[in-house]
C-alpha cells in the first residue's frame, strides 16, 4: 500500500510538470540573484601555488573553494575514509569496518562522523555543498548487482552464522531485511547528523538519484536514454532518503564513446529529467535544489568536451531547471605545469566563455520573466530550447588589467528575445513568491521560510 501511494504521488507530480505547472516553488538560490551557478570541485591547488598557473576560474563566473582545493567552504566532499566508519570493500578488495552495515556499530560511526564533520567543516555557518560519496554499496538489496553482489553474499553469510537453524529461503529473506534496515540507518542518520551540525549546508549523497541508463554501449542507434521503469520505481521507494536530503547530486559524466552524439543528449536529458522528478516529490514545501556533477573532460580521459557536448551538459542542465552544475576533476588536472596550462587554455577558450554565456542568460531570463524571484525552466522539458545569450543582442568580452581579469557581457534584451523566452520558458518561483511571473508574495510560503 505504501509503495502504491508513492507511485500515485510521483505520477501526479509528473503530470503537473508536463502540463507546465510546477507543483511547488524552488528553494532560494545558493547565492542571491544567481539562478544557475557553476562550481569547481577539482583538486587544482597545485596549479596556482606550485606551478604559478592561475586557472582563471573567477574570471569566468566559476565558484571555487579557497585555493582551488577539493574541499572547503563552497564544496566539501566526503569519501568513504573521510566520514565515520563506513563499512565496505574497496576496489582493491580490502575490508573496512565489518564490510556490511549490519556488522558495524552505528553509534560508533556517528561519533566518528561528528568529529570528522567538525574537522573538515570547522565553520558552523557553512553554506556550501556537503556531498557524501558512498558508492561501494547501495541501500536497496536489488540494486547490489555485479561487483556489489558481494554485499548480498556477505549478508546471507552473516545471517546464517547468527541463525543456523533457519532454512535457506528464510535466511535470504532475513539477510535482505537486516541489510536494508542497517543500510537505511547508516545513510539516514549520517545525513541527519550532518544537517543538525551544519544546518545551512546543502546535504545529500553523490549519484543519488541514478537512473541506470548506461546501455548506450550496447543499444547504439536504438538507445533512447530513458530510465528503466524498474529503476524509477526503485527511486520512488527511496522517498525516505529524498525527504532527509537538502540537495540532490546526480551526475552526467560523458564517456568518449558519446562524443558529439545524439545519444549523449539522450543520456543527459533523461538523467536530469529523473532528478527533477525526484526533487519535486521529496518535500511538501519546495523542490530540492539539484546540483549536477559533470566533468569538463570526457570520463577517464584528459580530452576536453566539444562545444556540442558543453551544450549537452551545461546547457541542458540549466534549461531543465537545476540550481547548478559542479565540475569534478582528478589529480591529473594539476599533476604538471602542462596539465595546469591545458586546463587554463580550455577555460580561456570554449569552456569559460560558454559558462559565462549560460550563467548570464539564466540571470537575464530570471530578471526578464520572473522579476528575479524565480528561475527559468523549459515549458516543455523535451524541447530543444536553451538559455543562451542571443548573439545579435549580446557579446562576451574579457578585460584584464594589472590586478584582475574579468569576463564582461555587453548588450540588452530585445523584444524578439523576450518573446522567445516567454514562448519557451516558464518561471519556477522561489519560496515566498507566486504567480505566472513570480510577481506576488506568497504569505503561506513566507511563513515556512
UniProtKB/Swiss-Prot annotation:
The protein's Enzyme Commission number: 3.2.1.35
EGF-like domain segment(s): 427-438
Keyword Ribonucleoprotein listed: no
Superkingdom field: Eukaryota
Catalytic activity: Random hydrolysis of (1->4)-linkages between N-acetyl-beta-D-glucosamine and D-glucuronate residues in hyaluronate
A biological process term (GO) from this entry: carbohydrate metabolic process
Tissue spec: Expressed by the venom gland.
Glycosylation sites: 67, 103, 111, 153, 357, 401
First-listed, main subcellular location of the protein, grouped into a coarse class: secreted
Subcellular location: Secreted
Active site positions, chain numbering: 135 (proton donor)
Record has Transport as a keyword: no
Record's subunit section: Monomer.
Family (UniProt): Belongs to the glycosyl hydrolase 56 family.
Record's protein name: Hyaluronidase-1
Organism of this sequence: Bitis arietans
Amino acid at each position: 500500500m505504501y509503495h502504491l501511494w508513492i507511485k500515485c504521488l510521483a505520477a501526479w507530480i509528473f503530470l503537473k510538470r508536463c502540463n507546465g505547472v510546477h507543483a511547488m516553488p524552488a528553494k532560494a538560490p545558493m547565492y542571491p540573484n544567481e539562478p544557475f551557478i557553476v562550481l569547481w570541485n577539482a583538486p587544482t591547488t597545485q596549479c596556482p601555488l606550485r606551478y604559478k598557473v592561475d586557472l582563471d576560474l573567477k574570471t569566468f563566473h566559476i565558484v571555487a573553494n579557497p585555493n582551488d582545493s577539493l574541499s572547503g567552504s563552497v564544496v566539501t566532499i566526503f569519501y568513504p575514509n573521510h566520514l565515520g566508519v563506513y563499512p565496505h570493500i574497496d576496489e582493491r578488495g580490502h575490508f573496512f569496518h565489518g564490510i556490511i552495515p549490519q556488522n558495524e556499530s552505528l553509534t560508533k560511526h556517528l561519533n566518528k562522523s561528528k568529529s570528522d564533520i567538525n574537522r573538515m567543516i570547522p565553520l558552523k555557518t557553512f553554506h556550501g555543498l556537503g556531498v557524501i560519496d558512498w558508492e561501494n554499496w547501495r541501500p536497496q538489496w536489488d540494486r547490489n548487482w555485479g561487483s556489489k553482489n558481494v554485499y548480498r553474499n556477505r549478508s546471507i553469510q552473516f545471517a546464517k552464522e547468527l541463525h543456523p537453524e533457519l532454512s535457506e529461503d528464510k535466511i535470504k529473506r532475513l539477510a535482505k531485511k537486516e541489510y536494508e534496515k542497517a543500510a537505511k540507518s547508516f545513510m539516514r542518520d549520517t545525513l541527519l547528523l550532518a544537517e543538525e551540525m551544519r544546518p545551512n549546508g546543502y546535504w545529500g549523497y553523490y549519484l543519488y538519484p541514478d537512473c541506470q541508463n548506461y546501455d548506450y554501449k550496447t543499444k547504439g542507434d536504438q538507445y533512447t536514454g530513458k530510465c528503466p521503469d524498474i529503476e524509477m520505481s526503485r527511486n520512488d521507494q527511496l522517498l525516505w532518503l529524498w525527504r532527509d536530503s537538502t540537495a540532490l547530486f546526480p551526475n552526467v559524466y560523458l564517456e568518449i564513446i558519446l562524443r558529439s552524439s545524439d545519444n549523449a543528449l539522450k543520456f543527459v536529458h533523461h538523467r536530469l529529467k529523473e532528478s527533477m522528478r525526484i526533487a519535486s516529490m521529496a518535500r511538501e514545501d519546495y523542490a530540492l535544489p539539484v546540483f549536477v556533477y559533470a566533468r569538463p573532460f570526457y570520463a577517464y580521459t584528459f580530452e576536453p568536451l566539444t562545444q556540442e557536448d558543453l551544450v549537452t551538459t551545461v546547457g541542458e542542465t540549466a534549461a531543465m531547471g537545476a540550481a547548478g552544475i559542479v565540475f569534478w576533476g582528478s589529480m591529473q588536472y594539476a599533476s604538471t605545469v602542462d596539465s595546469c596550462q591545458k586546463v587554463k587554455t580550455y577555460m580561456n577558450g570554449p569552456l569559460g566563455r560558454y559558462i559565462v554565456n549560460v550563467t548570464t542568460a539564466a540571470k537575464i531570463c530570471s530578471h526578464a520573466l520572473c522579476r528575479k524571484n524565480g528561475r527559468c525552466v523549459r515549458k516543455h522539458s523535451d524541447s530543444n530550447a536553451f538559455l543562451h545569450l542571443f548573439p545579435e543582442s549580446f557579446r562576451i568580452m574579457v578585460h584584464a588589467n594589472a590586478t584582475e581579469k574579468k569576463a564582461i557581457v555587453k548588450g540588452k534584451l530585445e523584444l524578439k528575445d523576450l518573446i522567445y523566452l516567454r514562448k519557451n520558458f516558464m518561471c519556477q518561483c522561489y519560496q515566498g513568491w507566486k504567480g505566472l511571473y513570480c510577481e506576488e508574495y506568497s504569505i503561506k510560503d513566507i511563513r515556512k521560510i
